[in-house]
């Protein structure tokens, strides 16, 4: 390739000198008149040769040429745009139908609605950084920045770093977009501990893959602006993240083993901690207390979530397009601060902490089997317990769900879900279940993709 580049440069340079050689055969009378034009032609030829060499070198290295040289010709006209400079732009539509007999369980109360349209813009910025932007569009939040981060891909020592907003590396399913799940919604333990749409954070993330014991491991650590969203309608007298102890800190250790050519296992542990604004109530009235222009005064209380997750995958080499199996389980425990410190400026008021206390745990187990090239069946069992310190009554949620998943192509997905839920004690999910505390839900989902970002079948 280097010989080709050198030859191309010499040919162009030689072409630029041809007029200079022909000048020796001309008369001395007009040689001076043509000297300036020859010099300009030679300069243009040299510039063109340099441009060609740089473009060839950039092409051989797999990197885009300099933007100032793209589409520029000697005449000043603009040529074709280098496709390497164009980012990958895609969109994913997520449509959900709720046929639950007791009424819709969707946040907006709709029976059929576009839950979200996600627009992704992704590209390599230069040889050192990659940028990813994911925008979520829906009727409730309009346009929201779901993720926007810059990834450093050329750090020494095998490290990779991100800065911006990203999905927090807590557990297994929280690291996937909701439309990429093999279920319509996140498991109940993730929805309760991390949020209905999962947990994101804005800050710095560092990871590294290594294999000191003969199998692959990955360590991930993050520092973000705050741990999730504050309690709805609650504000503190000073920012939760005013001190470094108010930031959100997370860590995750992933372990990966190949059991055979057709199967592998992943076992991971993760934790996240930070402070969140939790409500305070007036000790005399027992209700939330608005003061000094705040809808409801709150206090910064520490909350920690720890968990472990397990994933087994099987896909035979001879039938990889038609058969596969996934078994996944995840356990989480939420630990809440019992008596957070009340800010000094609130000591003159009679306040009582009204946020979550103690700890509670939950888990899910999910299995998915591929029947044909495009058809999958799945089932999930959820359990979520409530801390008995919340109101003295205790409580739990148990759910069993079944799924039928169909991929017409790699750019579309159709899914049907049936879920039976039973609650006792504290109402955790559906506040209007009545004396039976049971609910049957029927959800339908259609997901489609435009562009390179598409639903993942496995």
Positions of the model-derived regions?
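N-terminal periplasmic/intermembrane-space "pro-region" immediately following the signal or transit peptide
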Residues: 18-104, 445, 449-450, 454-458
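Short sequence motifs at beta-strands and strand-loop junctions characteristic
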Residues: 109-113, 141-142, 195-198, 243-247, ...
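Outer-membrane beta-barrel "beta-signal"
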Residues: 308, 406, 436-458
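Outer-membrane beta-barrel translocator domains and adjoining extracellular loop/strand segments
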Residues: 101-107, 138-149, 175-179, 231-238, ...
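Outer membrane beta-barrel
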Residues: 74-229, 245-261, 361-381
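Outer-membrane beta-barrel pore domains and translocons
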Residues: 92-96, 136-138, 166-168, 222-226, ...
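Detector for outer-membrane/organellar transmembrane beta-barrel domains
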Residues: 262-389, 398, 450
């Amino acid at each position: 390739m280097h010989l080709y580049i050198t030859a191309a440069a010499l040919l162009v340079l030689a072409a630029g000198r041809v007029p200079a050689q022909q000048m020796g055969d001309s008369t001395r009378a007009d040689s001076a008149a043509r000297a300036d034009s020859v010099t300009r032609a030679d300069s243009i030829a040299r510039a063109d040769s340099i441009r060609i060499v740089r473009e060839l070198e950039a092409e051989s290295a797999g990197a885009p040429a300099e933007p100032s040289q793209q589409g520029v010709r000697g005449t000043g006209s603009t040529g074709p745009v280098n496709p390497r400079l164009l980012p990958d732009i895609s969109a994913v539509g997520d449509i959900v139908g709720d046929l639950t007999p007791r009424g819709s369980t969707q946040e907006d109360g709709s029976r059929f609605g576009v839950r979200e349209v996600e627009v992704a813009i992704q590209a390599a910025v230069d040889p050192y950084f990659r940028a990813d932007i994911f925008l979520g569009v829906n009727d409730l939040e309009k346009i929201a920045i779901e993720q926007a981060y810059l990834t450093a891909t050329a750090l020494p020592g095998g490290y990779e770093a991100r800065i911006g907003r990203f999905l927090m590396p807590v557990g297994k399913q929280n690291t996937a977009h909701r439309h990429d799940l093999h279920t319509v919604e996140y498991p109940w333990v993730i929805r309760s501990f991390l949020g209905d749409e999962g947990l994101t954070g804005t800050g710095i993330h560092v990871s590294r893959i290594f294999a000191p014991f003969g199998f692959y491991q990955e360590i991930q650590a993050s520092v973000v602006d705050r741990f999730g969203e504050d309690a709805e309608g609650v504000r503190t007298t000073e920012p939760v993240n005013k001190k470094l102890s108010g930031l959100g800190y997370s860590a995750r250790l992933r372990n990966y083993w190949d059991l055979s050519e057709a199967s592998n296992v992943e076992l991971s542990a993760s934790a996240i901690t930070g402070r969140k604004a939790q409500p305070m109530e007036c000790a005399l009235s027992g209700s939330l207390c608005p003061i000094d222009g705040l809808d409801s005064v709150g206090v910064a209380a520490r909350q920690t979530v720890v968990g472990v997750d397990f994933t087994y995958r099987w896909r035979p080499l001879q039938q990889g397009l038609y058969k596969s199996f996934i078994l996944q389980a995840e356990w989480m425990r939420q630990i809440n601060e019992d008596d957070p410190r009340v800010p000094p400026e609130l000591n003159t008021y009679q306040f009582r902490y009204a946020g979550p206390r103690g700890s509670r745990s939950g888990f899910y187990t999910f299995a998915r089997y591929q029947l044909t090239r495009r058809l999958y069946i799945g089932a999930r069992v959820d359990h979520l317990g409530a801390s008995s310190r919340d109101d003295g009554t205790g409580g739990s949620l148990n759910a069993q769900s079944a799924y039928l998943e169909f991929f017409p192509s790699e750019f579309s997905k159709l899914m049907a879900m049936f879920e039976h839920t039973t609650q006792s004690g504290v109402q955790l999910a559906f506040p209007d279940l009545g004396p039976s505390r049971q609910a049957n839900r029927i959800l339908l989902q259609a997901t489609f993709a435009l562009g390179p970002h598409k639903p993942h079948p496995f």
